[in-house]
Structures are given as structure tokens and as C-alpha cells.
């Protein structure tokens, strides 16, 4: 199977404008992401709607494609990008442009999800380590079936452990945190971008619920590697400390 990584990157961000170009350890954040993805997959491209990002990616020797400015999601952007890139790709891996520490093991895990021929879409989950984190609505929870396919994603705490103090729930059930890396069979990517928003997606503000609600199967690979995304300038400061710790 042939895997291509596409990294959607926008300059406009409410909380941190220009974050793909922010310097981390002397290199733009987008360069960190690109180099991690390019080292594992057969090909990697940045998909952007901003000439500043386009120029920076070109300057460090990366592959980049310009996309429209009116996309409502990164999924729509990568679908346009793969159509422009062309080629005979089996699976498209979507890594966010603000994930400079995406690990080789995570990319390997999500690719291996497609060893199962019934996998249409894949994503990653990691076990929660505290109930405080489980209760954070910004950390979506996943429940999976016995075959490793997602049954539901929610910002609410699911499942509810009846008859136990919430402080002890982690000892009774392995709560799984969703990490926002996706991969799609190429034909499935085209199909999901044609779907209208669904009621569950609107309720939870989770795009992947649109796919589940329309009957697509999402395989969940598990990882023990935490992601360190950058959404704010404060996140960038923490990322600098994380990078320094890695280099020690």
C-alpha cells in the first residue's frame, strides 16, 4: 500500500495567528511537522491557503500545494490537495500543522490500521492518566468495540461507571483519549467530504461524528505517546521546554 501524508496549515488562527511559521528550536513549527511525516511516509505535502506558508515550505525544500481559502475543515483542504497532487495513493494520512512532535510510532500505528481490509478511516487513541483529564471537554473520549472500531466520540465522560466514585473510575475502565491524527482510504476521503454536517457533529462539534453517523467505520489504533499540539503562544513556550528535554 502507498501512503501519503498531507499537512493542512492555515495562517489565520483566532488564538495564535501565524502559528505554523512560529519558530520552535530555531525552525518553523510547520518544518518540524513536515520532516517528521516525510521521514516515515512515501511522500509528504503541506496544504495551505497562504503564500507566506507556501514560501517558507519551499524555502526548506518541502513539497507544498496551494488550496482554496473557503474550506470549512482540514479534511476538505486535504481532499482538494490530493486531487491536485494526483498519483496512485491508497491511503491519505492527515497530520495537523501544529503537531511538531508527531512520532514515527504513531504514524506506523495508524498505517497498520489498514492491514485490516475493512478499515475505511483510522485515528489514534491514548489511555487517560487522570480523571481530571477525562473530565476536560477539550479532550474527546472514544469508546471502541471489540474489533477496535470506534463506537462513539464525545466531549462528555463516556462510559458512565455506575455505582463507583468518579475519582476511582480509571481503575474500573480504560478511558481512551482521542488524538487528532486521521488516515483515510483515498476513495473514502472523497466520499466523506461530500457529506452534509450531521446532527451529532453539530451537537458535539466533532467532525468525525459525521462519518460515524453516516455508517463509515473508524479503526482506532492505540499509542502510548502523548501529542503536544500548539494552539496558543503559551503552548509554544511549553513546546520549547519539551524540545529541550528531548535534546538532553
Segments from the language model and where they lie:
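Conserved core of the sugar-phosphate nucleotidyltransferase
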Residues: 104-195
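Short phosphate-binding loop-to-helix
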Residues: 45, 51-95, 99-109
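N-terminal glycine-rich phosphate-binding loop and ensuing alpha1 helix
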Residues: 2-48
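Conserved alpha/beta core of the MobA/IspD/sugar-nucleotide pyrophosphorylase nucleotidyltransferase superfamily
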Residues: 87, 169-248
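A conserved hydrophobic position in a structured secondary element of the catalytic/binding core
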Residues: 48-49, 102, 184, 231
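Short, high-confidence coil segments that cap the C-terminus of an alpha-helix
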Residues: 41, 87-89, 117-120, 216
Amino acid at each position: 500500500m502507498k501512503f501519503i501524508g498531507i499537512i493542512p496549515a492555515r495562517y489565520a488562527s483566532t488564538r495564535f495567528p501565524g502559528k505554523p511559521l512560529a519558530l520552535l528550536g530555531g525552525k518553523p513549527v510547520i518544518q518540524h511537522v513536515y520532516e517528521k511525516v516525510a521521514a516515515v511516509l512515501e511522500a509528504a505535502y503541506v496544504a495551505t491557503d497562504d503564500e507566506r506558508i507556501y514560501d517558507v515550505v519551499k524555502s526548506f525544500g518541502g513539497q507544498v500545494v496551494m488550496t482554496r481559502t473557503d474550506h470549512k475543515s482540514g479534511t476538505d483542504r486535504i481532499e482538494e490537495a490530493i486531487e491536485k497532487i494526483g498519483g496512485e495513493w491508497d491511503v491519505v494520512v492527515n497530520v495537523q500543522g501544529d503537531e511538531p512532535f508527531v512520532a514515527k510510532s504513531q504514524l506506523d500505528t495508524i498505517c497498520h490500521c489498514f492491514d485490516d481490509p475493512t478499515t475505511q478511516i483510522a485515528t489514534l487513541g491514548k489511555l487517560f492518566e487522570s480523571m481530571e483529564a477525562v473530565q476536560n471537554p477539550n479532550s474527546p473520549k472514544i469508546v471502541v468495540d471489540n474489533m477496535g472500531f470506534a463506537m462513539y466520540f464525545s466531549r462528555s465522560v463516556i462510559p458512565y461507571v455506575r455505582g463507583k466514585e468518579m475519582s476511582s473510575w480509571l481503575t474500573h475502565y480504560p478511558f481512551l483519549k482521542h488524538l487528532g491524527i486521521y488516515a483515510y482510504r483515498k476513495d473514502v476521503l472523497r466520499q466523506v467530504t461530500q457529506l452534509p454536517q450531521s446532527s451529532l457533529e453539530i451537537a458535539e462539534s466533532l467532525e468525525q461524528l459525521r462519518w460515524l453517523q453516516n455508517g463509515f467505520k473508524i479503526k482506532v489504533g492505540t499509542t502510548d505517546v502523548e501529542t503536544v499540539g500548539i494552539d496558543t503562544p503559551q503552548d509554544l513556550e511549553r513546546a520549547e521546554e519539551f524540545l529541550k528535554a528531548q535534546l538532553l
